[in-house]
């Protein structure tokens, strides 16, 4: 399996919505996801299965005044126990470093 990690863009919104419905009792709405996409404080890293083009994981952070607040993290149940969440966090930490985050916390 080949997994691509990248920043969220408009092509990922429906996949994040589907994954949110799969993983959470109270999933995010499409409007909420689009709001996050357009929020200059929010950064999201997605994991995409390159064979299926399916969004299989995501993690988000709000970066405010040098601090990163992790807002959400999810991995599809059928892809768990493969290190995807760990890799998402590593990629997210790299993003936070580019914005000079000194601290990162889980909301």
Regions found by a protein language model. Give the residues of each.
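Acetyl-CoA-dependent GNAT
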Residues: 4-80, 86-99
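Conserved hydrophobic beta-strand within the GNAT/NAT acetyltransferase core sheet
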Residues: 70, 104-106
């Amino acid at each position: 399996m080949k997994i691509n990690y990248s920043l969220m863009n408009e092509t990922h919104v429906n996949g994040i919505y589907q994954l949110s419905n799969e993983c959470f009792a109270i999933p995010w709405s499409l409007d909420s996801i689009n709001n996050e996409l357009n929020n200059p404080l929010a950064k999201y890293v997605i994991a995409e299965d390159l064979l299926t083009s399916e969004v299989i994981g995501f993690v988000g952070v709000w970066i405010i005044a040098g601090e990163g607040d992790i807002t959400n993290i999810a991995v599809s149940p059928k892809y768990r126990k493969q290190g995807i969440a760990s890799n998402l966090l590593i990629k997210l930490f790299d993003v936070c470093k580019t914005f000079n985050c000194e601290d990162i916390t889980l909301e």
